[in-house]
């Protein structure tokens, strides 16, 4: 077996990636989320595949085909809700994974980090298009509002929006192409994940101290395979509790009403995992400014390596920047709450304040804190 594992051209790649991979001996449970994201992706592809067997991407039958899946297909309700709530679990793991990367300075592995940002955009695009497919009220109006933002692009905006719609409004052509893209993107994401892992294995994993761990590494199997297996069990248990006991808690009641272009819902809002970005978008009165702020809210992650001023890699031994980090986390929670509120006083001003705070903490306060800590510790 050892000979096959180390000599076979295909198996030796798996061996170097998941079995004999030298891994720091001190990585904590925060390093579990990479494998959990892989599990989420597998769950989403499998459940999505079975849903696609029964779904029809036509405006007249899309809504009823989802109802048919839940009512008439064997365990269709389970597959549908596992897919919907699986997306929420996916984003919880994603946010924790990115948060870990920011806290422990993993952004210094620039290729891996940039690949991760591309993956984040790809997953967000996939989730957005997936939300349109049931063709409920929030599906239709969410698609209309978000795609319409592209009309803010000077000169080509309106043409671009109509090109994406495949007509003069969100209609059959839009739904069909969104289904096609929603189906193909997870496979593209899988390929990007392999590139992400390729870059990661070039440098090796970071660790909570941020120090070079070459002198103290252990094989990935059995230590971290068992650790990841435990994480996977906890994730699947959480997903099943969510799916079986609270299937609709993260959804919108409006999406149980079939799409009606003549009736606008009182509050158009995306799924919970986009609310922080939606709040930043809404906090700017200008349409183009809002779109730019929306894109920058994610793209700012790419500036992290440039904004790193500290001589230490992680925040483990940096209390001032730690404080800034947790204020940033609280700020993101406030933005998520605001994104789901109506556009009226006092939510408008809270959203604007939280949006300014978000960019200020990342661009100004955290780099300043790093410099102050260098001076306190006399690290020239």
Curated annotation (Swiss-Prot):
It is found in: Mitochondrion inner membrane. GO terms for cellular component: mitochondrial inner membrane; respiratory chain complex III. The chain crosses the membrane at residues 33-53, 77-98, 113-133, 178-198, 226-246, 288-308, 320-340, 347-367. One of its GO terms (molecular function) is metal ion binding. InterPro entries: Cyt_b/b6_C, Cyt_b/b6_C_sf, Cyt_b/b6_N, Cytb/b6-like_sf, Cytochrome_b, Cytochrome_b_C_euk/bac, Cytochrome_b_N_euk/bac, Di-haem_cyt_TM. Heme b b566 binds at residues 97, 196. Keywords: Electron transport, Heme, Iron, Membrane, Metal-binding, Mitochondrion, Mitochondrion inner membrane, Respiratory chain, Transmembrane, Transmembrane helix, Transport, Ubiquinone. Heme b b562 binds at residues 83, 182. It comes from the Eukaryota. A ubiquinone binds at residue 201. GO terms for biological process: mitochondrial electron transport, ubiquinol to cytochrome c. The keyword Transport applies. Coiled coil: none annotated. It is a multi-pass membrane protein. CDD domains: cytochrome_b_C, Cytochrome_b_N. Its cofactor is heme b. Binds 2 heme b groups non-covalently. The cytochrome bc1 complex contains 11 subunits: 3 respiratory subunits (MT-CYB, CYC1 and UQCRFS1), 2 core proteins (UQCRC1 and UQCRC2) and 6 low-molecular weight proteins (UQCRH/QCR6, UQCRB/QCR7, UQCRQ/QCR8, UQCR10/QCR9, UQCR11/QCR10 and a cleavage product of UQCRFS1). This cytochrome bc1 complex then forms a dimer. Heme 1 (or BL or b562) is low-potential and absorbs at about 562 nm, and heme 2 (or BH or b566) is high-potential and absorbs at about 566 nm. Component of the ubiquinol-cytochrome c reductase complex (complex III or cytochrome b-c1 complex) that is part of the mitochondrial respiratory chain. The b-c1 complex mediates electron transfer from ubiquinol to cytochrome c. Contributes to the generation of a proton gradient across the mitochondrial membrane that is then used for ATP synthesis. Belongs to the cytochrome b family. This is Cytochrome b. It comes from Microtus xanthognathus.
